[in-house]
Amino acid sequence: MFSPMALRPRCAKWLIVTGLFLMLGACVEKPSTLERVKEDGVLRVVTRNSPATYFQDRNGETGFEYELVKRFADDLGVELKIETADNLDDLFDQLGQPKGPVLAAAGLVSSEQRKQQVRFSHPYLEVTPQVIYRNGRSRPTTAQDLVGKHIMVLKGSTHAEQLAELKLKYPGIEYEESDAVEVVDLLRMVDEGQIDLTLVDSNELAMNQVYFPNVRVAFDLGDARSQSWAVAAGDDNSLLNEINSFLDKVEKNGTLQRLKDRYYGHVDVLGYVGAYTFAQHLQQRLPKYEKHFKASAKQEKLDWRLLAAVGYQESMWQAEVTSKTGVRGLMMLTQNTAQAMGVSNRLDPKQSISGGAKYLAYIKEQLDDKIEEPDRTWFALAAYNVGTGHLDDARKLAEKEGLNPNKWLDVKKMLPRLSQKQWYSKTRYGYARGGEPVHFVANIRRYYDILTWVTQPQLEGDQVAEGNLHVPGVNKTKPPEENPPL
C-alpha cells in the first residue's frame, strides 16, 4: 500500500544529492580568457586594413601591427587568426563578441571615451596627431584657422573626438566623419583637393606621405599620444596581463625597436622633391626596363621590386651613366664586378641588370648564416654599396660595443664610425665612407616600399589598374613651392 510518509525520506535524499551537484557545479570556475585562447589554440585578433597596421602583399600577411601580434601569438604557442574591420565602430563591435576577436591590434590611441568600451594595454608606439593640408593652399597654423574648412576624419576616431572638443571653443569648425574611408583615402582626398584638411597620426602620415606628393603637415594638434592594444571591457585580466608582460619583454630585449626600425626607420628619407621625382620616373622610365628586372630577379630568386629599387638608387633608371669613380650603367657596376658577373657591356641595360642581380644574390649567399631576414637583405645591400670587408669591420665594432652584429639596427650605427680615424684605424679594411651605405639602404627600402605599394591593387583600390601603375599626384602639374616642405 502506498504511503506518503515513506516517500518523504526519499525526496529528502534526492534534494540533498541535487543540491550537492549544484554546489559542486557552482564551484567549477569558468576558464579565463587566456585559458580559452590556449585551449582553442587560436588567438583571434581584429585590426584595420592599412599600410601601418595590416595588409597582404605577394609574400603574404604583413604590417607593423601584424608582425607584433604574430610574435605574441607565437609566444603563446597558438595560431593567429586575423579579422579586418570595415571601420572603427565595427572594430569595437567585434571585440568581445562570443567566439569573436579577443584582442584589437589596430594602432589605437587611448581616450576617456574609448575607455568606456575597452581596456588598453601598456603603450608600444608614440604618435602625434597632425593637421594635414594641400601644398599650394593656405596653410592653417592654429585651431582657429580650421573654421570654414572642409575637414574629413575617420568616424569614431580620436581625431573626431579632438574636433568635437575644439568645436566647443570654435563653433564655426565643421567636420565630417566617414566610415567608408581609411587613412590612405583621406590623404588622397587632400592630395587631389577633394577636401581641405584631415587629421592623421604622425606614423600613418610618415608611411604614406611619399605616395601623395602634395600633402603637408599644417601643425601638430596637441601633444604626442601612445598607441596600445585593447581587450573588451568585460573580460577578465588574464589576457591583458599576458599582453603587458609580452610588450614589456619585447621592449627590453630590443624586438620592438627592431620592428619600429623595419617599418618606420626609413620612411622620411626621400622628402618632397625625391618623392615627386621618383613618382615621375616610375611611369616614364621603369616601363622600359621592367621586363629585365623581372627576368633577372626570377633567375636569381630575388624580388624584382627590390632589384628595381637598387637600380633607381644607383642610376635613377638611366642606362648610359658613368660616375666620377668609373662605375657605369644602370646598376653602376665596377669593371671588376662586371667581369666577375659576366657583363661585357656595362651600358647595356639588360646586361647591367643581370649583373647587378647576380652580384646581389652572390653577396646574400656569402653572408654569415647567423644573419636572418629581413636583416640579411639590408646587409647585402650595404655590402653592395661599401663592400663586404667594410661591412665585416662594422659588425666587429658592433660586437665590441655589446651590440648584435647580426641585426641591421645595430650595425648601421657602427658603419659611420668607419670614416673616423679613432675607429677605422683599428679595423682590418680601414677607412670607408660609412654613412653612405646607411643612406643607400634607407633609400632603397623606401623605393621598395613604394614599388610594393603601387603593384598591389588591393592597397589602392580602384586607383590601380592591372598593368597600369598609378602613383597619386603623378599626372598633375607640379604644385607650387611657396610653402616649403616641413
Curated annotation (Swiss-Prot):
Catalytic activity: Exolytic cleavage of the (1->4)-beta-glycosidic linkage between N-acetylmuramic acid (MurNAc) and N-acetylglucosamine (GlcNAc) residues in peptidoglycan, from either the reducing or the non-reducing ends of the peptidoglycan chains, with concomitant formation of a 1,6-anhydrobond in the MurNAc residue
Localization (cell): Cell outer membrane
EC number of this enzyme: 4.2.2.n1
Annotated region (Non-LT domain), positions in chain: 27-267
Region (Disordered): 464-486
GO cellular component: cell outer membrane
Record carries keyword ATP-binding: no
Residues of the active site: 314
Keywords, in A-Z order: Cell outer membrane, Cell wall biogenesis/degradation, Lyase, Membrane, Signal
Molecular functions (GO terms): peptidoglycan lytic transglycosylase activity
Signal peptide start-end: 1-26
Biological process terms in GO annotation: cell wall macromolecule catabolic process; cell wall organization; peptidoglycan catabolic process
Listed InterPro entries: Lysozyme-like_dom_sf (IPR023346), MltF (IPR023703), Solute-binding_3/MltF_N (IPR001638), Transglyc_AS (IPR000189), Transglycosylase_SLT_dom_1 (IPR008258)
Membrane topology annotation: Peripheral membrane protein
Region (LT domain): 268-486
Family named by the database record: In the N-terminal section; belongs to the bacterial solute-binding protein 3 family.
Its job: Murein-degrading enzyme that degrades murein glycan strands and insoluble, high-molecular weight murein sacculi, with the concomitant formation of a 1,6-anhydromuramoyl product. Lytic transglycosylases (LTs) play an integral role in the metabolism of the peptidoglycan (PG) sacculus. Their lytic action creates space within the PG sacculus to allow for its expansion as well as for the insertion of various structures such as secretion systems and flagella.
Domain notes: The N-terminal domain does not have lytic activity and probably modulates enzymatic activity. The C-terminal domain is the catalytic active domain.
PANTHER family: MEMBRANE-BOUND LYTIC MUREIN TRANSGLYCOSYLASE F
NCBIfam families named in the record: PRK10859.1
Protein name: Membrane-bound lytic murein transglycosylase F
